[in-house]
Design a protein with these regions (language model features):
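Pepsin/retropepsin-fold aspartyl endopeptidases
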Residues: 1-131
């Protein structure tokens, strides 16, 4: 599966749209494919839309960019990309300034499910499902 890079503020980024599912609810959601992220992280507003009780998940803490401590809650969700469904554990995080523009998919939950090729010159991402 190939996806074009998308522009945000004039900058090309490896952002794709996937479908997040939890029980009978689903939502299309933009995510940055982030090879530097340990886990998949999505905005708390998405959890709320899906009917996930945020604080019933496993609470974790991490240090974000700039050394700021952040708290997030892990929940199992399904992601659908290219018609294929994958169950992952994802962190949901609130941001005081409002929702994030897009989520992030990282090593656990994404790179362990797909072989990812970034081609910046072609402005293209290629995903191959691991067998």
């Amino acid at each position: 599966m190939k996806f074009p890079y998308r522009r945000f503020g004039g900058v090309a980024r490896p952002v794709i749209t996937l479908r997040l599912k939890w029980h009978s609810r689903s939502v299309r959601y933009d995510v940055l494919i982030d090879s530097g992220a340990d886990e998949c992280m999505f905005d708390a507003a998405v959890a709320e839309f899906l009917g996930i009780n945020l604080e019933q998940g496993e609470m974790r803490k991490a240090t974000g960019v700039g050394g700021q401590m952040v708290v997030y809650f892990m929940h199992p969700v399904d992601i659908e990309i290219g018609g294929r469904m994958h169950t992952i554990d994802a962190g949901f995080i609130s941001r005081p300034g409002g929702p994030f523009e897009y989520g992030a998919v990282g090593q656990k939950g994404f790179f362990d499910k797909f072989i990812v090729t970034f081609d910046y010159l072609k402005q293209e991402i290629e995903l191959k499902t691991r067998s």
